[in-house]
Amino acid sequence: MTAYFNKTEWPAKAPKTDEERKEFVASLHKRKTELFMALIEKKLLPLRPGVQRLIDEALGKGVKVAVCSTSNEKAVSAIVSCLLGPDRAEKITIFAGDVVPRKKPDPAIYLLAATTLEVDPSSCVVVEDSNIGLSAAKAAGMKCIVTKSGYNFLSVKYFCMIVVVS
């Protein structure tokens, strides 16, 4: 959010000092996470079609499955457990939070996952939902499938070879 506000403009009522702005952005992130978690817990933000089946088939064949997100680790773990159930969640490795110095489109989080799971990046398949994630996966040397959503379809279809419409 800081980068966005610095690039566009800080809201008129936003704090003026760097320290106050840092606290302001942290409070926005916290509130966003609370609202997002409420949507997940109420099942108002379900998995995209086909995701659960894909995960089940991968796990059933012994494929290593990971979730890579620069969001808060606690929130990501809760989301995975809530949407996929605790049995699946315990079989999925989560890379989240500030485990890498740079966020997507930098490939660091994907490369960390591949290294940790001892998998060659070229044999990884990433399922993403954005151009930023697609760029990160490609920069890591990984194949990428982008799922369609209302907020990304028009831009993503021009940048990738595989768009999943389910």
Cite the ranges covered by each PLM segment.
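Short, acidic loop-to-helix structural element flanking the phosphoryl-transfer center
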Residues: K22, M37-V67
